[in-house]
């Protein structure tokens, strides 16, 4: 049996350079993540990892919050170099002293190495102590001019494999405005201006997934015109959402009760987008009226 390879990214670097954002980014990329791993525990932890999937991936923040960091890290890295079945890289996050000082002042936190309270002194000492580790790092990212979003994008470009790059998923959902707009929606579209099947007795108790209602909604000229404009708006911007590192884009179609018009539109949009993207279709309020009637 072929031994599975473990992929490890050790995230380290200057305090305030963005390690928290980085570890969150790795989690979004499908890595198992741990923040503030004591260096001495790292080899033992890797031995205890139960490999359940092909090519398991770990991202661990190892930094100077562990008091033994500087005395242990070199020996630990030497041990990892000789460990079979392990592919590991060091990601070092850095930033200019001026920017680090500004970030500390913004958060009103003290630097862990600033014994006398002077932030700049702590930064200079940390930079001196971390210089050998920075020189060993395969990936050095300067976050001085990067926003958190830009850092996430940078890490996604460097550490996403082909499968991860294609993991962008679209959630297309319908909802009723009377029950509130979905709090997780990224894009919200209102179709309440269209003719409402609710006022036709033969369609009232059906939903937009049923053919008679779907045909009634979509066969109106204004429905087709709006849908074509909607598709022309959404399709060109999807690659940009993916490029920005967004893992899930939620598109919500709303009508009054979330039973007829929005359901039909969400159904059609999901079908069309699924030709080129990974799409999930959902209808939050489709059966809400039926459930209310049954309870009464």
Curated annotation (Swiss-Prot):
<dbReference type="Pfam" id="PF03668">
    <property type="entry name" value="RapZ-like_N"/>
</dbReference>
<dbReference type="GO" id="GO:0005524">
    <property type="term" value="F:ATP binding"/>
</dbReference>
<comment type="similarity">
    <text>Belongs to the RapZ-like family.</text>
</comment>
<keyword id="KW-0067">ATP-binding</keyword>
<feature type="binding site">
    <location>
        <begin position="63"/>
        <end position="66"/>
    </location>
    <ligand>
        <name>GTP</name>
    </ligand>
</feature>
<keyword id="KW-0547">Nucleotide-binding</keyword>
<comment type="function">
    <text>Displays ATPase and GTPase activities.</text>
</comment>
<dbReference type="InterPro" id="IPR005337">
    <property type="entry name" value="RapZ-like"/>
</dbReference>
<dbReference type="GO" id="GO:0005525">
    <property type="term" value="F:GTP binding"/>
</dbReference>
<dbReference type="Pfam" id="PF22740">
    <property type="entry name" value="PapZ_C"/>
</dbReference>
<dbReference type="InterPro" id="IPR027417">
    <property type="entry name" value="P-loop_NTPase"/>
</dbReference>
<dbReference type="InterPro" id="IPR053930">
    <property type="entry name" value="RapZ-like_N"/>
</dbReference>
<feature type="binding site">
    <location>
        <begin position="13"/>
        <end position="20"/>
    </location>
    <ligand>
        <name>ATP</name>
    </ligand>
</feature>
<dbReference type="InterPro" id="IPR053931">
    <property type="entry name" value="RapZ_C"/>
</dbReference>
<protein>
    <recommendedName>
        <fullName>Nucleotide-binding protein SP_1566</fullName>
    </recommendedName>
</protein>
<keyword id="KW-0342">GTP-binding</keyword>
């Amino acid at each position: 049996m072929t031994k599975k390879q473990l992929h490890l990214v050790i995230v380290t670097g200057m305090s305030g350079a963005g390690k928290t954002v980085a570890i969150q980014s790795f989690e979004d990329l499908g890595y198992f993540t741990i923040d503030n791993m004591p260096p001495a525990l790292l080899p033992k932890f890797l031995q205890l990892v139960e490999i359940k999937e092909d090519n398991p991936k770990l991202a661990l923040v190892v930094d100077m919050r562990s008091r033994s960091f500087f005395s242990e890290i070199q020996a630990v890295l030497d041990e990892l170099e000789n460990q079979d079945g392990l592919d590991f890289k060091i990601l070092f996050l850095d930033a200019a002293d001026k920017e680090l000082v500004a970030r500390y002042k913004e958060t009103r936190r003290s630097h862990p190495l600033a014994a006398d309270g002077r932030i700049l002194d702590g930064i200079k000492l940390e930079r001196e102590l971390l210089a050998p580790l920075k020189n060993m790092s395969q990936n050095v990212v300067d976050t001085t001019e990067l926003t958190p979003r830009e850092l996430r994008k940078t890490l996604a470009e460097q550490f996403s494999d082909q499968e991860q790059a294609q993991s962008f998923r679209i959630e297309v959902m319908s909802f009723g405005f009377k029950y509130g707009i979905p709090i997780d929606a990224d894009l919200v579209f209102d179709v309440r201006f269209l003719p409402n099947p609710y006022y036709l007795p033969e369609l009232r108790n059906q939903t937009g997934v049923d053919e008679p209602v779907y045909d009634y909604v979509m066969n109106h000229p204004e429905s087709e015109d709006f849908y074509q404009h909607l598709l022309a708006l959404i399709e060109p911007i999807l690659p940009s959402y993916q490029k920005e590192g967004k893992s899930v884009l939620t598109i919500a179609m709303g009508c009054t009760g979330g039973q007829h018009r929005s359901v039909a539109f969400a159904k059609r949009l999901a079908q069309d987008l699924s030709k080129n993207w990974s799409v999930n279709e959902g209808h939050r309020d489709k059966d809400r009226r039926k459930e209310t009637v049954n309870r009464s």
